[in-house]
Amino acid sequence: MLGPCMLLLLLLLGLRLQLSLGIIPVEEENPDFWNREAAEALGAAKKLQPAQTAAKNLIIFLGDGMGVSTVTAARILKGQKKDKLGPEIPLAMDRFPYVALSKTYNVDKHVPDSGATATAYLCGVKGNFQTIGLSAAARFNQCNTTRGNEVISVMNRAKKAGKSVGVVTTTRVQHASPAGTYAHTVNRNWYSDADVPASARQEGCQDIATQLISNMDIDVILGGGRKYMFRMGTPDPEYPDDYSQGGTRLDGKNLVQEWLAKRQGARYVWNRTELMQASLDPSVTHLMGLFEPGDMKYEIHRDSTLDPSLMEMTEAALRLLSRNPRGFFLFVEGGRIDHGHHESRAYRALTETIMFDDAIERAGQLTSEEDTLSLVTADHSHVFSFGGYPLRGSSIFGLAPGKARDRKAYTVLLYGNGPGYVLKDGARPDVTESESGSPEYRQQSAVPLDEETHAGEDVAVFARGPQAHLVHGVQEQTFIAHVMAFAACLEPYTACDLAPPAGTTDAAHPGRSVVPALLPLLAGTLLLLETATAP
């Protein structure tokens, strides 16, 4: 006869089994469901035709630290927020028809940082760890290795071709990833001149904020990073009583004012209301919006009355940039995905990924894939894992069904290293469902570190639009920059010989040579002249 404890255990197991079976749609038990779904996907794939024209516009969406495990977990979370089981609901990026893998290593490191990876996917050249916009001949923190080793970004090439260009990020605009569009520095942490050693300043090395306004003419700059633009002691408009949030510059410069003075029609804003007004004003030709002293707030902490979302910043940028008949280049970064992972707080990383995906979806609604090449990728991954055989439909932040060898619960999401390593009385603490579901919860880590690290595996590249079919297979991260340059007939691919996108004239898109088209007319004219002058 079974005892009361065994009966209770069987009851709980039966309830768990009933719940797990009850949430699975009945139609999924029928093979026809899966055969029909696969046949529909196959039919769509057979109809897929490469867009062989040139791209008028280029958009690269960069999910900082958004490895494949992050994409999968975010897909489930986004689906569950819509009251679905999770994995069956595609993300906006999932709908891009072409996918490849990108090798993210730096020249000197198996596991990369965001500075050297930015050099790879934006400039088409690999560099050394923690350097930006420089070839591998430059050495980290050695100012005298800068000059002569600069490499040029696709954004810079787009500007030279007459396109408008913009940078949108949830980090500070001087951070490693956005800086890859415009800066050349041997140290990614030289945000303002206060961060640059005196010896490097004497050698002529400029801080990243100075390069932001002087290296090239950027039409739209949106993100955080106010304090690096103003002289030390300048109060911040949002936090006037907090000295630590004020200006940091030692040279006494007001870089925002310098930027405004050089550009007719330029506008500077620091809050959401001003951004919305400026983006709708046809007299505004250049827009700089800096919404926090440093990085922007996580989406879960964002004050929607003061701080715009990534989607709103992307929409504002597209409004301004799309006015140029020659097209545009736009860099959009979900930068705080990375920061959430570094903190071992998966809730923050995944909600940032969802916001990033929302921006991708909105941009797709505001542009056409006939003339806009859109790429989505990550600079690197994280030591972020997703396992433990959780039941489908269970919370992505929940507990695995079984216990660990120490007879304690463990979460579905874990980190290989980081600040989540905790011992309580010499042992791993137990964790409850309510704890693991908190936005502030740190997932447990195997190795104790103050900050969780990047990972070295390949990351995904999603592509849609003209020349997107070139994104295939397993490629070096540098390939991304070259695909963008070729698709838009930018240097070094100005002789791309691609037809202009629909609705675009050759004058607005000079990449295709007009000489071949004129040859028959020229030959006919010469023949008529020869006939007329014949005796």
From Swiss-Prot:
Glycans are attached at N144, N271. It catalyses: a phosphate monoester + H2O = an alcohol + phosphate. Its EC number is 3.1.3.1. Zn(2+) 2 binds at D338, H342, H454. InterPro entries: Alkaline_phosphatase, Alkaline_phosphatase_AS, Alkaline_phosphatase_core_sf. Disulfide bonds join C143-C205, C489-C496. Detected in placenta (at protein level). It is a lipid-anchor; GPI-anchor. Its main location: membrane. Alkaline phosphatase that can hydrolyze various phosphate compounds. In most mammals there are four different isozymes: placental (ALPP), germ cell (ALPG), intestinal (ALPI) and tissue non-specific (liver/bone/kidney) (ALPL/TNAP). This is Alkaline phosphatase, placental type. It comes from Homo sapiens (Human).
